[in-house]
Amino acid sequence: MSRLKIPSQLLRGGRGFSVLSRPAANYAGHVPLTPVERCTMAVGSAIGSLLNPRRHDLIATLGETTATPYFIYRLRDAMLSDPTGRRILRDRPRITSQTLSLPYLRSLPPTSLGATFASWLDREGVSPDTRSRVRYIDDEECAYVMQRYRECHDFYHAVTGLPIVVEGELALKIFEYMNTGLPMTGLSAAAVVRLKGAERQRFWDVYLPWAVRSGAGSKELICVYWEELLERDVGELRAELGIEVPPDMREMRRRHRKQKQQEKQEK
């Protein structure tokens, strides 16, 4: 009779591990968790982020606590099987305002990836420095993979044109789920209950079909070395990566508001 093999991670998590005797960190900022702690934090952060989708700290915690033991390894293996992905793992670049010169990006041709990225940051009023550090993934290399995914998120926004409203984040998270398979991105679909009537209808009719189709049909975006493509034409790059541009969400929201105002005036 064959014996059941229990993963060593679970065996280590079940003995000699308490709040007072926590194992040494595997990298700077690492916080080892027991299976019970991981499960508790996953549930708590899922509920908290659903109640308040703007709590990016809870969304980050949900992403880390649900990424193991399988999903982040699958994403790491996808990088290892790709020449560019392997270079990224070797170089370990970071995407911050220190590693990317925003003034330079703004000086690039308007149709370039760099100018598109800088324009999106300026329009949304955000910075590439807002991504928190990974803490709850035990494997140091996989922690970098999660950090890389997190810091590339704004590039996904820029090439799709989706804004950072709840409706836009939800559409992009489904796109990411179809592309990366990370559970947190799929669990974000629960936030559809936070959308208003017109937003919810747009999501079901327009942005969910787009996210499923484009996310599944595009290249593994975790293997894209965005920093080396900043001068590329963004339209050509989208075609190369298989990214379909969704209908302009800001324009659709603007037209809906204008229509509602006209209806009020006619009453």
Swiss-Prot record:
Disulfide linkages recorded for this protein, renumbered to the chain, are none
Provide the catalytic activity annotation: a 4-hydroxy-3-methoxy-5-(all-trans-polyprenyl)benzoate + H(+) = a 2-methoxy-6-(all-trans-polyprenyl)phenol + CO2
GO process terms (BP):
ubiquinone biosynthetic process
Q: Give the matching Pfam families.
A: Coq4 (PF05019)
- InterPro entries per record: Coq4, Coq4_euk
Which top EC class is named for this enzyme in its record?
Answer: lyase
Subcellular compartments = Mitochondrion inner membrane
Range of the transit peptide: 1-17
State the annotated membrane topology for this chain: Peripheral membrane protein
What keywords would UniProt list here?
Lyase, Membrane, Metal-binding, Mitochondrion, Mitochondrion inner membrane, Transit peptide, Ubiquinone biosynthesis, Zinc
Q: Name the needed cofactors.
A: Zn(2+)
Query: Binding residues for Zn(2+), per the UniProt record?
Result: H153, D154, H157, E169
| Transit peptide recorded as keyword | yes
EC numbers: 4.1.1.130
Q: What domain of life? A: Eukaryota
Provide the primary localization: mitochondrion
Q: Which GO terms describe its cellular component?
A: extrinsic component of mitochondrial inner membrane
The pathway this protein participates in, as annotated, is: Cofactor biosynthesis; ubiquinone biosynthesis
Family as reported in the entry's similarity comment:
Belongs to the COQ4 family.
Describe the task this protein carries out: Lyase that catalyzes the C1-decarboxylation of 4-hydroxy-3-methoxy-5-(all-trans-polyprenyl)benzoic acid into 2-methoxy-6-(all-trans-polyprenyl)phenol during ubiquinone biosynthesis.
Subunit organization: Component of a multi-subunit COQ enzyme complex, composed of at least COQ3, COQ4, COQ5, COQ6, COQ7 and COQ9.
**Name of protein:** Ubiquinone biosynthesis protein COQ4, mitochondrial
